[in-house]
Regions:
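Terminal RNA-binding accessory module
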Residues: 1-78, 82, 379, 387
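Rossmann-like S-adenosyl-L-methionine
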Residues: 2-17, 25, 231-502
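Short beta-strand elements
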Residues: 21, 137-149, 153-160, 212-216, ...
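Short, acidic/hydrophobic/Gly-rich beta-strand patch recurrent on exposed beta strands
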Residues: 29-34, 157-160, 224-226, 366
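Short, conserved phosphate/pyrophosphate- and ester-handling motifs at nucleotide-, phospho-/glycolipid
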Residues: 46, 175, 309
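Extended interfacial segments that mediate partner engagement and assembly in macromolecular machines
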Residues: 66-78, 84-197
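Short, solvent-exposed loop/turn elements at beta->coil junctions and helix N-caps
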Residues: 127-134, 200-201, 207-209, 213, ...
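Internal alpha/beta scaffold segment
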Residues: 166-208, 229-264
């Protein structure tokens, strides 16, 4: 420690040189100068960097990376030229191997620190994170905001971190390669036909967002333009409703792109940050595209809930099904089931499966997916898990051999956890998108009589800080016991020898 810096007060715009010794939960580099902590976006553990303080507090500060003086062995050149400005990827400067280690450590440390579990116990049951062979071009869905730059030029791209400022870009490296051609086609059409971009501040302008989806197994592509449309549509000569000026030109250009299967319009006139409205009109070919996940075929509409990384989702769900240990006779409850992907996948190995989801559209999709795949042993309920589960258990006496839960980031509701403990399933499979709330819920379940058996992270979103985790818990029966063989002769001899020596 440098005595000359003892008691120094750090302030905004100070330039400092620091070694990065840790990684924060949001992927930021962490360094310390005389006990004063600096959080630096885009810095990598092992870097020596020059930074400028942007926001100073008493014991810590947020700083901007000015220069990498000595790069870490884990630092790489990002594929994306706007990686620093864009808010989508936080870890592109870090090697993929180090990203996986960061996520493994993040899950482990949260369970130990926030859940109060013994580190050695967690280390003994943690399995290696499930990574991707190729961590790019994995997203089958992307939503691109449309706006204008300071010169009035129409742009599309991605929001900068913690803002709604659009960073222009059409070639996202974690999205499908078709995104670029589709977006450039739409921008060119808008410029030629003087179609306005939406302005969030004024609420004026027509085109708000572009949604692009692709079925990885089918190769089918969907484009949906979200527009601020307040008038009445008119019919073209072909009978198609028109919502855009010279709409036929746009359809002609987009339909020429290989794989194009569905073009639609979504109406959203609300002054809101919510991207999609509820009114969707198909203007070319099909309303949906198809994809396959876990051996099941799904029809996907613009509003459908569907995993954005089907490659990793299959691995994650396969692990969850393996943990469930199904033999063909079990009754399974799947809470927060979405469109029923896990529910339907487990139905093939269970006696009866029940899915619960609060969003009606998702349950409609789940029921349709069950019919489409010829599944007859699955039932779905609309409602809050913490309300539906107690009702079915207390009023109808429905039980569970296995309960699978995949809650939102806030974790599982305490009422649902309490009912799960009362139902006392043999196994609980917990799929989590937030290891902090996972740790909290695991503590409740373990205090209620369950034991952690396995923990396995899964990298669903490479280049970002997000990590999924699947956990297996088993019921500890009151009569569980440990068999210990004791050699009484040996014990007696040891007691005698101890008494003689004294």
């Amino acid at each position: 420690m440098n005595d000359n810096n003892m008691g120094r007060i750090y302030k905004k715009d100070d330039l400092l040189t620091v070694e990065i010794t840790d990684i924060g939960n949001d992927g930021e580099g962490i360094g310390k100068i005389d006990g004063y902590t600096l959080f630096i976006k885009d810095a990598v553990i092992g870097d020596k960097v020059k930074v400028k303080i942007m926001k100073a507090k008493k014991n810590y500060a947020y700083a901007h990376l000015e220069e990498v003086i000595r790069p870490s062995d884990d630092r790489v050149i990002p594929k994306c030229p706007i990686a620093r400005q864009c808010g989508g990827c936080q870890l592109q400067f870090m090697s993929y191997e180090r990203q996986l280690q960061f996520k493994q450590d993040k899950v482990r440390n949260n369970i130990v620190r926030l859940g109060g579990f013994d580190p050695e116990e967690i280390d003994s049951i943690m399995e290696p994170i499930i990574g991707m062979d190729d961590p790019f071009e994995y997203r089958n869905k992307a939503q691109f905001p449309v706006g204008t730059d300071k010169n009035g030029k129409i742009i599309t791209g991605f929001y900068a971190g913690h803002s709604h400022n659009i960073i222009p870009g059409t070639d996202c490296k974690i999205g499908v390669k078709e995104n670029k051609e589709i977006l450039e086609t739409i921008i060119s059409y808008m410029e030629r036909n003087h179609v306005s971009a939406y302005d969030e501040e004024t609420g004026k302008g027509l085109v708000r967002h572009v949604l692009i989806r692709k079925g990885f197994t089918s190769g089918e592509i969907m484009v949906c333009l979200i527009i601020n449309y307040r008038g009445k549509s008119s019919s073209s000569k072909s009978g198609v409703q028109e919502y855009l000026p010279n709409q036929g030109e746009l359809i002609e250009k987009l339909s020429a792109i290989k794989g194009m299967t569905s073009i639609s319009i979504d109406i959203n006139t609300e002054k809101t940050n919510v991207i999609m409205g509820l009114e969707v009109h198909t203007i070319w070919r099909r309303e949906t595209i198809r994809d396959t996940l876990c051996g099941l075929e799904f029809n996907i509409s613009p509003l459908s809930f569907y995993q954005v990384n089907p490659v990793q989702a299959t691995k994650l769900y396969d692990q969850a099904i393996e943990y469930a240990g199904l033999t063909g006779n079990e009754t399974v409850w799947d809470l927060y089931c979405g469109i029923g992907t896990i529910t339907l996948a487990m139905s093939k190995k269970a006696g009866k499966v029940f899915g619960v989801e609060i969003i009606p559209q998702a349950i409609d999709d789940a029921k349709q997916n069950a019919v489409q795949n010829g599944i007859t042993n699955a039932e779905f309920y609309v409602g809050k898990a913490e309300e539906v589960l107690p009702q079915k258990y207390q009023e109808e006496g429905i039980y569970a051999d296995v309960i699978c839960i995949d809650p939102p980031r806030k974790g599982c509701d305490i009422a649902a956890l309490d009912t799960m403990l009362k139902m006392a399933p043999k196994r609980i499979v917990y799929v989590s998108c937030d290891s902090a709330t996972l740790a909290r819920d695991l503590r409740i379940l373990c205090d209620g009589g369950y034991k952690l058996e396995s923990v396995r992270p899964c990298d669903m979103f490479p280049m970002s800080v997000h990590v999924e985790t699947v956990v297996l818990l088993s019921q500890q029966k009151p009569d569980d016991y440990i068999e210990i063989e004791v050699n009484l002769d040996s014990v007696w001899e040891n007691l005698n020898s101890t008494s003689v020596s004294q």
